Every structure is written in structure tokens, then in C-alpha cells.
Amino acid sequence: MALAGQGPGDELVPAGLRLRPDPGSRTLADGMVITGGYPARVLRLSKPGARHVAAWWSGMPVPDNPKARALARRLLDTGIAHPVLDITAPAGKPDVTVIIPVRDRPAELARCLAGLADAPWVIVVDDGSRDQAAISSVAASAGASVLRRPVNGGPAAARNTGLAAADTPLVAFLDSDCVPGPGWLDALLPHFADPAVGAVAPRIVPHEAGRSWLARYEGASSTLDMGQRPSIVRPGSRVPYVPGAALVVRKEAAGAGFAEDMQVGEDVDFVWRLGASGWRVRYDPAATMGHQHRVRLREWFARRKDYGTSAAALELRHPGAVRPLYASIWTAAAWLAAAVGYPGAGAVVTGTGTALLARRLAQVTGEDWARPAGSAAWRLAARQAGGGTLAAARPLGSAISRTWWPAAVPAAIAVRRLRLPLAALVLAPPLLDWLDRRPPLDPVRYVAARLLDDVGYSLGVWQGCAERRTVRPLLPLLRGRDLASRHKGLLVPGLTCAGPD
């Protein structure tokens, strides 16, 4: 397996960096406790730490103080805060090489290169194209150099060929169906002022609005679009991975590059290995990259299935990172009780879990656990454990439609009382997504497209599991009482549905 370069680990953030809180972050106990991140956690601050956080939230920079810089790193790593960057065009040419792997598709390549007129170094890696002359002609017209691979080795091998030839500190990997717009690189490069950042990805958006129902669905729910909110990237985070379609990487961090034995999911594996090596990977939606989405039904469905086949390989390489559902034992027990016909027992389980979580949180906030009235610990516990159990319908429904439907459908046929609950759980996520996104597509076709999307992905998951002889990507991951983390702070139990699409 290709290895990433060893990262800086607990490198302090640069002095002078500015931070802003994530929209989900909150301060409690007169600023002495801060909550937020994904998964949610609670941090108890010292008095100097609380003063630093208050100053940062008001716009002050991180001072040249080791303890303050270490605290800022913790806030960034947990997702409680995000960097505020000074995005200005560099005075000279950026010291970055753009690498574009391509096999055939000269028209798409020409469109991609047209958006790179300001890039100083561009390498096109011809990965065994049938018409090499067409690729060479397009690249020459744009002033790009061409590296030829005699046989097709896949995207990982092509990217590695370009990586080996680049001699700049940064490399930007772009797929040939990307359409760069003005300023995309200028918005990403400031992240690398932090020596711990190994890679940054922009938001992938449709290059142009399509008219078909599938094009409109893709415009709102593409698996390449990781959303509107910035994030640290790692398994279990709000953004658990970023696609390799557009990715700027510190060459030192890239090491030997992508795993060439993976034809699908190699970009997810690469990003996760960067994180495991101590590098930080960030997602910044302030930078956008146009993309020509697949909008032909057969091609689109086949690609979804291909994505699913990578789940088994990724789970074997990164144990616990690709599961259909992540849940606390309390949440899982409450839903199981409700599913078998005992909603009252489920409510008791939820109440018990809320009380126990409040007791643990009170140890952090310094409150009296026995006095719930006005208690920040109880409010947070009710929101996370109580409210989280109710909100679990969404990821649970997604897990059923994206992974478990081959078992859920026979169960619904055999047991009549399961039909309505299962149907409600499966339909809830796409309907809620439609309400959130309000795409230019009616809810009936949007829900149908989403379910078709899920079926394609799940077929790939099951196929990959059969080929790799593992069931791990089919199993939920339950978290017990001990939620200790390498990131200091108390992790708050919750439930998420995660994994590469």
C-alpha cells in the first residue's frame, strides 16, 4: 500500500491565525465550558483558555503563546472552530503544479485546461488513451506538458505518475471533467500557512444546470458535493472524506501517493492515510470547482454501484471507518425497543441515558447533577441524548435504504407490523433532504432518484463484501460508555450515518 508522508502531529497553529466558531459551537458556565464539533464534545477550559476563546470569537488573532496555540489547534482539530483566512491573490505565480489524469475525453480536457490559464505548471497524464494524438494536441494548445502511460493503470497510478514528476511544494489534482473557475486556487492556498495542513479540498458544484430530472437531482445531491459548511476531514467528522476530483496537497504529505491497487475509493483511502499520518485535511466550501456530472441514467447508476464496491476495501484498510450506522448503545437500545413494539421501554432507555449523560457532563461544567433546574449539563444532555434519539430516524432510515434493504424488504413482507415503520424510516431521509435543499425538482421524483441512488450504492456494497469476504461494512458500530478520544474532551453520544458515497 502507498504510504503518506509522516505528518507533524501536534504541531501548534501559527501565531496570528484567526478563528471563528462553528455554527454548532456553544459556550457554557460563563465561558469556562465549550461544546461543539462533530461528533459533539465538551471541553472544560482554564480561565486563561476561556479568555483566549472569548478574544478569538471577537476577531482577535491567536497570540504567540504555546498554550494558546495548542488550544487553538485542539479547537480546529475537533471542529469546534475553523480558520479565518486572508484570501488575496498571490503577488507572483503560485508554487503549485496542477496534475490532470485523463483517458481519452479530449473535449472535457480542453474545457478543464481553459480554466487553468493562470496556473504556472500543468501536467496532463495520458493514462493509455486510445487517441493519444488528440490528448497531446489539446494539452499543447493550453501550454501543458504531457506524460504518457503506455497502458491504462487507473486514476491512482496516473496521479502518482504526475506526482513523481512535480517539483513544487504543492500539487493540485484535478479530474479532467472539472471546470475550474476564477479564484479557486487562491481561496485554498492560504490554508497551507498552517504547517500541519496536508491537503485542502474545494466544494464540487455543477458546471451548468441540467434540465433533465437526473441532472436536477445531481445538481442538488451529488455525492461529490460535501455541503456548505467547512470542516476538518476525517472518519466520523461532518465531512468524513473529500473526493479526489479536486484536491490540493502538500507534496511532502503525499509521500508515495495513491494506492494503485484500488480502482475505486483510492481518493478516500489517500485522504484517510494523510489524517492517520498526522496531517490535517480540510474542506473549504468558500472555494468551488465546477464539475460535469454524469446525467445519463445507466452510466450514473453504474458509477453509484462502483462507489459502493469500495466500501469493503476501505473498511479493511481503515477498520471502523465505513459502517452504515454509528450509534451510542443507548440510542440503539431505544430504537430497538420501539421497533419490537415497546415504545414505552424505549422512552425509559432514552431517559436513563439522558440522566447518565447529564451526570457526566455535570462533572465537566462543575454543576450539581441532582439539581436539573437551570442546569447547562441537563440541557445539553437532553439535546444530545434525548433529542438525538428522536433525530436518529434520519440516519437510521438512510442506513436501511443504503445498506440494509436486502434484509429489510423480506422482513417487511414477512412481518406486517414492520411495513409502516420501515416505509416511514426509508422515506423520511429523502423527504427531509428535499425540504432542506428545495431543489428544482418535485418531491416525488427527488425521493425516487434518492432511493435509486441508495439502491445502486448498496448493490455495490454487498458485491464488495462478497468479493472481499467480509461483512463489516454491513454492521453498525455501537459506542459504549467509554467515549475517550485522542482529542481531549468528553465525547457526547450520538448517531450518524457515514461512509464514502
Enumerate the language-model features and the residues they cover.
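N-proximal low-complexity "stem/linker" segments adjacent to membrane-targeting elements
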Residues: 3-19, 25-115
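Acidic donor-binding/catalytic loop of UDP-sugar-dependent glycosyltransferases
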Residues: 107, 131-132, 178-191
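Acidic donor-binding segment of Leloir-type glycosyltransferases
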Residues: 113-148
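Glycine-rich, basic loop-to-helix element that forms the pyrophosphate-binding segment
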Residues: 149-166, 176, 182, 187, ...
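Short aromatic/hydrophobic "clamp" motif used to bind/position activated sugar donors
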Residues: 171
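Conserved donor NDP-sugar-binding/catalytic core segment of glycosyltransferases
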Residues: 182-216, 292
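Short, flexible, basic/aromatic active-site loop/helix in glycosyltransferases
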Residues: 202, 218-239
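A short, conserved alpha-helix in the catalytic core of glycosyltransferases
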Residues: 243-249, 253-288
